[in-house]
């Protein structure tokens, strides 16, 4: 590294030394300096995400080793992306804002000893643009400058042409304490969440970008980011698209305060196991069964509002269930087809009495937990995320029943 970059490099070394004791942050070994160069030794990695997906460009040749890495990522994309959220959470816990999350800076390292065979280990690298938050401060003022890479920066890091001409991008000509402009307001950890959302989309769509247009024009990404023109069509990938769509849409919110924290990303239903998803739906049923019904409580009314998203235009969930399954519900409780409460009760009751069902009905609904969960989510794709949103809307995420879903580690 040339002498004029020594200051930047020494900052990177310092941050690497502070943060590298984590499996999803690149490992620093040593550094040496002579009169001409600074040498930094970090762990050897196999490729970057950009090397593998190449922005989705057709006709790019991949080596066998690269194709194996792509296959390993795609087999369990949730595990791969969770690692990135985990690594970023580690940096944020150390008060480090990366400011340049992008595919070129996400590397595929060699697996650690305790990893399952065939899985990959992703690490966050390149700390040249990182900034450390002082104690008791959540925002850096006047440091937006040239942080980030075009097309991967959060909207608050993108200056308008007039602002660039006036010098406001460096915090010179404007009072940041009184300005309403996001650039002048400073940098929060949320800038990394936005960029990570773009990377999540990139991996799940094999190299597409959420702010390209339908024809894939990379040149207009920055404009689309500033104008809030996300294009998430590529994420509509069938029955399993609702959870990643919800998460990425949340991460790409225009206003920093509307984005999730790294911990919230890690605890999102996208990363939950099938067993955890099914248990959550059953806990939702248990909770709302105890709400007053005549007249309905505000919480129960809010749950039923989501029936318009979960049920189709016929407004009858019973019409989507198999005849044998409906018969197995029994006559003890009456089920009304247009009610979310009854849908959740049916799901919970048959899960709890799964072994009482005939073998023919079991074959229809599949085994617990994965087959049974999919029986419901393929018929009602928005069920899980609607219940998740309802818990948040009602402020129930801190309740003992729901707290483990929103604060516990997931993978």
PLM regions: where:
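Conserved C-lobe activation region of Hanks-type protein kinase-like domains
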Residues: 158-234
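Protein kinase catalytic-loop region centered on the HRD/HxD motif
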Residues: 84-96
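Activation segment signature within eukaryotic-like protein kinase domains
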Residues: 80-81
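Activation segment/activation loop of eukaryotic-type protein kinase catalytic domains
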Residues: 104-163, 167
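The N-lobe alphaC helix and its flanking beta3-alphaC-beta4 segment of protein kinase-like domains
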Residues: 2-23
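Regulatory extensions appended to serine/threonine kinase catalytic cores
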Residues: 277-411
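Short beta-strand micro-motifs within the conserved protein kinase catalytic domain, predominantly
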Residues: 27-38, 46
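Terminal C-lobe "cap" of eukaryotic-type protein kinase domains
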Residues: 254-258, 263-278
